[in-house]
Amino acid sequence: MSKPLDVLLVTPPSRVQVYQELSRDFAAIEPPVWSGLLATFLRRHSCSVAILDAEAQGLDHQQTAEQIAAIAPRLAVFVIYGQQPSASTQCMPAGRKVCELLNALGDVPTLVMGTHPSALPRRTLLEEPYTYVCQGEGPATILGLVIALRAPQHSLREVPGLWHMEEGNPVGNAPAPLLTALDQELPGQSWDLLDMTRYRAHNWHCFDNLNQRSPYASLQTSLGCPFTCSFCCINAPFGMPMLRTWSPDNVIGQIDRLVRDYGVTNIKIPDEMFVLNRRHVIGICDRIIERGYRLNIWAYARVDTVQDEVLEKLARAGFTWLGLGIESGSQHVRDGVEKGRFGEGDIVATVDKIRSYGIHVAANYIFGLPDDTSESMRATLDLALALNTEWANFYCAMAYPGSPLYTLARRKQWTLPDDQDGPGWIGYSQHAYESCPLPTDHLTATQVLAFRDRAFVEYFTHPRYVSMLQRTFGAPVATHVAAMCEHQVRRRHHDLAARPAA
């Protein structure tokens, strides 16, 4: 009799609920970065591992549960991360649905991990259908749990970072220490366990060639962030604001493999703070330049961390886009969320500098921060229109579990999606029908959401923006964006507001 698979790493299907119609042609299909890293770690510790990416395979909840039950692993690990770190919470409902269906089919032990479970481990254990919850980044917890499941004499109390039930009571173990030698402990992703042809880049990432969005990969070069922005929950799995990096030699080795074995040229660097450590960035760029690869890479940057020397290297290495966190057009509002280290003049100068190196800018803005008013939100949109960057993401402020803003919202008793009468965790999705952002001291959640949706249309249909698209990328891209604007997301908030009084 063959031994059971030790670990099945599962990505539940959530894209359609999270992005509505935008999921079909416009949003990315992201490879599961954390599953790839965890698989490599576990393999190095003699565990048998497989990855079930139900999202990429187009499986529904029932099909996903049936596949897990058919594989019957020793442990099914639900890896709840989204396209960026704060997107974990909105993926929780899909995981719950699959796990409930799985529990009805058999007795497969389940563990849930991700930013959200790490932020609320006790609540997750009590409210969700999983057998176990992981608090922390995961590798040591999963390995320890597999060892305990293989040999029942091992106590669950010995598994670091594990939450489990004992005699009807939730028990949380001491956290696992963070991995520090990333090159040795998490040396890369197990791409051989994935069908790399299924993944595609964001539409804007490939504006230079919309027909070449696949193949695509997401490559982590660091973990964590040293900053403490109030709206961000990135450090929830790590327990502290800090930055750990893989070496440039390790990173180029992974890029070599992507290019050689999978034909990947579209690459996302999801590190929140990629353009921060000058030596790290230049070391990676120099190695790419030496190889002469023709890549299409995007990465995040901060307004106050972009230097000319770094930009020159990024451009030569194939970094065609930088995502820039501008957040608000109001200095007062930026001050309130720990983003006040730079002013509007700095923002304009940084955007101009990035573009002068031939790098496109994807600017990120947030409406509905705690100090926002109608006037300050309009100022943010006016700044976006003035900058006229090649792409813009417009978000509503969300008090994500694990962020300081969530703690503040609970203390001030602000309305949150997970309140008793709220839509639940899906309400933390920016694009879902059930989206439920924070109110501000001056505006209701409905007003914030309505402004965000109007801002999206105003920006992407603005004649100046459309003209810039045509000049920079050509008429087909302008036509593509116009088609995108026809897919207006529906909102529960607006439907409720539009109902006639009984």
What are these regions (language model features)?
Residues S14-Q20, P85-A87, S118-R122, F227, ...:
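Flexible glycine/acidic-rich beta-alpha junction loops that bind and position SAM and/or redox cofactors
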Residues A39-A50, L102-V108, D261-Y262, R291, ...:
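A structural motif corresponding to the C-terminal end of an alpha-helix
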Residues S2-I252, G263:
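Acidic, low-complexity intrinsically disordered segments
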Residues Q184, Q189-A362, L369, S374-E375, ...:
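Radical SAM [4Fe-4S] cluster-binding motif and immediate context
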Residues R123-L143, K313-L322, A379-F394:
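Structural recognition of alpha->loop->beta junctions
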Residues M1-L9, A65-A69, P404-A502:
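Radical SAM enzyme core and accessory elements
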Residues F78, Q135, I269-D271, L324, ...:
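Conserved beta-strand positions
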